[in-house]
């Protein structure tokens, strides 16, 4: 029985640590909001040619000698508000219009930011032998300073005429109710020579600390996908140690943060080069370079890619590219979590409230686990019934551990008791519970999700700490219901203090998680009462 108690204590400690780790992801301070700017200059601006993935020409006189000032155009759709610099045609800011910065606030979540210590921009262009971004960034022409979507789609064209004879129209194509932006290059060759270009797309983000926890840093970094690896994180430290260099059919690259993702998806029917690098001023870059495209004299081609700027919506991401939905990081239990999330989504589609959906899925999961819970309690009861015999064996054999162990095994065999019978059911249940925790922590659907009364956001802590206090009380009642047979005073004190310690943790956990734990404890209390009543009828001791 003592070993089972120790196992439960270790398991609870592991869950607490994992919850604390994931809480850091939830509560990392939001990045500073950008100041509106109509032009971008300086070495930190996204028009710096040093960011372009292909090496600059050996003729140093061809390099830009000063920063180029670009005009910033505004694009507004039903989901996005973007700023695009005409130098390079880079997306230098992106606000997600359907995602408030804070619940009830007028400000929207800023995913891309143009400058300063939190710079995060999406760059793209044409490199290769005749690429217009090869020696310096092109300055595009545009017909107007702002574009607003009025129908189901919007196309924003930027044009550039190169001295080499290439006429380039860079189009940003938006669709209603979508966070995916199609980036299309229409390239016409007016010269008498064959021209060769390669498309690139990359994300540049500052690696500077943005106020994460002193205990556990928030994961904010790169990720990529290849034919062999559907999803692989590539952190800023990884980029610092070694540049990413992968050649793969299809693939994609991304920068990830909690609830949101920015990703470049190149053509999926060609081979692409994925890369990363660190700039001298501490910015991380991850991106792709497409295949070389030859353009015959008098001919034109279209070269397209996709830029996703939005929430980690699994259904949407799965349709855009293979493995992109895995940026919703459920950890090593993702293969369980994805089915639990699908079930949670189904319940929500029926009742329309995420809080009640959490309650219902907890009831279903605990109900499905009831046979295991019953086996666990009955095994523990059988072990308690053997305690007098175990005490007698300890008194008989004293310090002779070998004989003591042999005698105990014979006793277990004779009484048909599995000493680990109380642990195995718990081992089977723990992955289910942990997987559901990841779902509640990682799913953007719970961000700013209302429940009832004072709980208006399930992704943040209970403002009045009602749920944590009730959860601590439920843990105390569970502890009283389950007799403590351990004799070690230190273990007894630790177990007695556990409800208080967990309540303190729950004070800072998201309300959705605490709600899940509270309902789980209440159901466990009810199940324990039923199981104990059944055991008493069969003559098994429950205390």
From Swiss-Prot:
Keywords: Cell inner membrane, Cell membrane, Chaperone, Membrane, Protein transport, Transmembrane, Transmembrane helix, Transport. Residues 35-61 have a biased composition (Polar residues). GO terms for biological process: protein insertion into membrane; protein transport. Coiled coil: none annotated. PANTHER family: CYTOCHROME C OXIDASE ASSEMBLY PROTEIN COX18, MITOCHONDRIAL (PTHR12428:SF65), OXA1 (PTHR12428). This is Membrane protein insertase YidC. The chain crosses the membrane at residues 7-27, 341-361, 421-441, 451-471, 499-519. Required for the insertion and/or proper folding and/or complex formation of integral membrane proteins into the membrane. Involved in integration of membrane proteins that insert both dependently and independently of the Sec translocase complex, as well as at least some lipoproteins. Aids folding of multispanning membrane proteins. Interacts with the Sec translocase complex via SecD. Specifically interacts with transmembrane segments of nascent integral membrane proteins during membrane integration. One of its GO terms (cellular component) is plasma membrane. It is a multi-pass membrane protein. Belongs to the OXA1/ALB3/YidC family. Type 1 subfamily. The gene is yidC.
């Amino acid at each position: 029985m003592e070993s089972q108690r120790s196992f439960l204590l270790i398991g609870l400690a592991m869950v607490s640590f994992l919850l604390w780790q994931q809480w850091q992801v939830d509560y990392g301070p939001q990045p500073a909001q950008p100041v509106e700017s109509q032009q971008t200059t300086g070495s930190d601006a996204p028009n710096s040619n040093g960011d372009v993935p292909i090496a600059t020409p050996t003729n140093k006189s061809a390099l830009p000698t000063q920063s180029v000032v670009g005009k910033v155009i505004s694009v507004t759709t039903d989901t996005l508000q973007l700023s695009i610099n005409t130098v390079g045609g880079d997306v230098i800011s992106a606000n997600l219009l359907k995602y408030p910065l804070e619940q009830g606030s007028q400000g929207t979540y800023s995913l891309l930011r143009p400058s300063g210590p939190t710079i995060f921009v999406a760059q793209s262009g044409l490199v290769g032998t005749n690429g217009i971004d090869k020696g310096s960034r092109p300055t595009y022409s545009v017909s107007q300073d702002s574009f607003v979507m009025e129908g189901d789609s919007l196309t924003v064209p930027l044009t550039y005429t190169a001295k080499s004879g290439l006429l380039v129209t860079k189009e940003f194509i938006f669709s209603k109710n979508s966070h995916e932006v199609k980036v299309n290059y229409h390239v016409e060759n007016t010269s008498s020579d064959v021209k060769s270009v390669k498309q690139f797309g990359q994300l540049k983000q500052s690696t500077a600390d943005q106020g994460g926890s002193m205990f556990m840093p928030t994961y904010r970094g790169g990720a990529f996908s290849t034919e062999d690896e559907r999803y692989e994180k590539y952190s800023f430290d990884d980029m610092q140690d070694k540049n990413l260099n992968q050649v793969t059919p299809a693939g994609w690259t991304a920068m990830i943060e909690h609830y949101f993702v920015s990703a470049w998806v190149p053509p999926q029917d060609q081979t692409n080069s994925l890369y990363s690098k660190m700039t001298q001023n501490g910015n991380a870059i991850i991106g792709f370079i497409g295949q070389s495209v030859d353009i015959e004299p008098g001919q034109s081609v279209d070269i397209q890619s996709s830029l996703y700027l939005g929430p980690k919506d699994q259904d949407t991401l799965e349709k855009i590219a293979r493995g992109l939905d895995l940026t919703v990081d459920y950890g090593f239990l993702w293969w369980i979590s994805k089915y639990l999330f699908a079930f949670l989504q189904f319940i929500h589609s029926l009742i329309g409230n995420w809080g009640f959906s959490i309650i219902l899925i907890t009831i279903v999961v605990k109900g499905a686990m009831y046979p295991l819970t019953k086996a666990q309690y009955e095994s523990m009861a059988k072990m308690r019934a053997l305690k007098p015999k175990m005490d007698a064996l300890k008194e008989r054999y004293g310090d002779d551990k070998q004989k003591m162990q042999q005698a105990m095994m014979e006793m277990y065999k004779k009484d048909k008791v599995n000493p680990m019978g109380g642990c195995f059911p718990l081992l089977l249940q723990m992955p289910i519970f942990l997987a559901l925790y990841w779902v509640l922590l990682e799913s953007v659907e719970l961000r700013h999700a209302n429940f009832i009364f004072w709980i208006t956001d399930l992704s943040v802590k209970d403002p009045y700490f009602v749920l944590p206090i009730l959860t601590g009380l439920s843990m105390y009642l569970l502890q009283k219901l389950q007799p403590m047979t351990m004799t070690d005073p230190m273990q007894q004190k630790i177990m007695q203090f556990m409800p208080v310690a967990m309540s303190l943790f729950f004070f800072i956990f998201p309300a959705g998680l605490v709600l899940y734990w509270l309902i789980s404890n209440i159901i466990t209390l009810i199940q324990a009462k039923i199981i104990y009543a059944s055991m008493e009828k069969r003559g098994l001791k429950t205390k």
